[in-house]
């Protein structure tokens, strides 16, 4: 089937447009952001949050963010807990996966002093036990992109850096999310929704925008893939280079193309899956935010062991860097160089 990557309804998208064009919100924010969220438009309208600022698309040394950045504060006893939202594909879904300004998006969140990044993405399932409407917390990635996307801050002439990527996601972040596994529901069916998580759960990232052939889909299964999308690379790599704990929540919409005798998929089924996924994404995001606002988890305080790692990863000596290169580095790490 032709998987629809935007996991939220047009109505919610229009609602977001109103939020993101609200001239009454300040266009500057001088506080500290605790959590960055990258994903679909419906996540901007959570009951536990109140928008307090709407930053125009942020200009970074690596381009401009894919959308304005909405800053919201927690509605409750800890109103100092702030969340920054970026729509990965733009307000009107105008950026295809290959053209998303991934470096600008992640750099903006880093510049806002985010402590962690939570990402949402629609995926196709490569395994029979991961059903449409199920959610997955992957811990590994197979990169099948084509080298078209800018995937590093440290790959330009005059700057060399190598970061470890053996564990591309934050296991502590995933475990934190997994405590809410019983919160997602499937009210329209007797079939329950599941949140899948283990250390070998793997997401395949393909270039797109076309979807897999049947042969490719079967190959990805042989590789050990569990789900497939077009967004996790280079997002996860850039989060690592920014020393940010990062976890993607994958939302299954279909079985990709590997099933030889798949039943025809109807428009009603697709819309139902997308609607249910959007509802559960809101539920899960709300639970995570409410819990974090009550007590920020340790992995966010400590950076999950990533803090300071970039100092050891840059091979180029500062005295050999150009002024422009140093300015770019200081945008991400103002206290390192």
Swiss-Prot record:
UniProt keywords, alphabetically: Cytoplasm, Glycosyltransferase, Nucleus, Purine salvage, Transferase
Predominant place of localization: cytoplasm
Binding site for phosphate: 41, 88-89, 121-122, 231
Sites annotated Important for substrate specificity: 212, 267
Pathway annotation from the record: Amino-acid biosynthesis; L-methionine biosynthesis via salvage pathway; S-methyl-5-thio-alpha-D-ribose 1-phosphate from S-methyl-5'-thioadenosine (phosphorylase route): step 1/1
GO CC terms of this entry: cytoplasm; cytosol; nucleus
Example of a GO MF term: mRNA binding
This enzyme's EC code(s): 2.4.2.28
Keyword tRNA processing among UniProt keywords: no
UniProt GO BP: glutamate biosynthetic process; L-methionine salvage from methylthioadenosine; purine ribonucleoside salvage
Family matches, as Pfam families: PNP_UDP_1 (PF01048)
PROSITE patterns documented for this protein: PNP_MTAP_2
Presence of keyword Aminoacyl-tRNA synthetase: no
Domain of life where this protein originates: Eukaryota
Residues involved in substrate binding: 230, 254-256
Localization: Cytoplasm; Nucleus
Subunit structure, as described in the record: Homotrimer.
Role according to the record: Catalyzes the reversible phosphorylation of S-methyl-5'-thioadenosine (MTA) to adenine and 5-methylthioribose-1-phosphate. Involved in the breakdown of MTA, a major by-product of polyamine biosynthesis. Responsible for the first step in the methionine salvage pathway after MTA has been generated from S-adenosylmethionine. Has broad substrate specificity with 6-aminopurine nucleosides as preferred substrates. Seems to be implicated in the regulation of the expression of the ADH2 gene.
Extra facts: Present with 4820 molecules/cell in log phase SD medium.
Family indicated by similarity: Belongs to the PNP/MTAP phosphorylase family. MTAP subfamily.
Name of protein: S-methyl-5'-thioadenosine phosphorylase
Species in which this protein is naturally found: Saccharomyces cerevisiae (strain ATCC 204508 / S288c) (Baker's yeast)
């Amino acid at each position: 089937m032709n998987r629809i990557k935007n996991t939220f309804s047009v109505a919610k998208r229009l609602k977001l447009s109103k939020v993101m064009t609200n001239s009454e919100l300040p266009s500057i924010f001088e506080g500290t952001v605790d959590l960055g969220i990258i994903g679909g438009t419906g996540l901007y309208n959570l009951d536990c949050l109140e928008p307090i600022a709407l930053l125009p698309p942020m200009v970074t040394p690596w381009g401009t963010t894919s959308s304005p950045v909405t800053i919201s504060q927690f509605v409750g006893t800890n109103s100092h807990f702030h969340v920054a939202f970026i729509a990965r594909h733009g307000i009107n879904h105008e950026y295809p996966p290959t053209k998303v300004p991934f470096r600008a998006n992640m750099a903006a969140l880093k510049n806002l002093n985010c402590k962690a990044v939570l990402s949402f993405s629609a995926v196709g399932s490569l395994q029979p036990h991961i059903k449409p409407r199920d959610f997955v917390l992957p811990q590994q990635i197979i990169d099948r992109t084509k080298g078209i996307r800018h995937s590093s801050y440290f790959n330009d002439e005059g700057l060399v850096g190598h970061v470890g990527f053996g564990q591309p996601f934050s296991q502590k972040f995933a475990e934190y999310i997994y405590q809410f596994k019983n919160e997602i529901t499937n009210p329209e069916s007797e079939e329950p929704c599941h949140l899948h998580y283990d250390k070998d759960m793997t997401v395949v990232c393909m270039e797109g925008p076309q979807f897999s052939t049947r042969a490719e889909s079967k190959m990805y299964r042989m590789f050990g893939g569990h789900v497939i999308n077009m967004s996790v690379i280079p997002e996860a790599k850039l989060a690592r280079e920014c020393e940010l704990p990062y976890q993607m929540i994958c939302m299954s919409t279909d079985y990709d193309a590997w099933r030889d005798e798949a039943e025809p998929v109807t428009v009603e089924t697709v819309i139902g899956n997308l609607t249910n996924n959007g509802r559960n994404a809101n539920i899960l995001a709300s639970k995570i935010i409410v819990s974090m606002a009550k007590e920020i988890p340790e992995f966010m305080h400590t950076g999950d062991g990533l803090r300071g790692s970039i100092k050891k990863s840059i091979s180029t000596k500062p005295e050999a860097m150009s002024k422009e290169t140093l300015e770019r580095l200081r945008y991400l790490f103002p206290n390192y160089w």
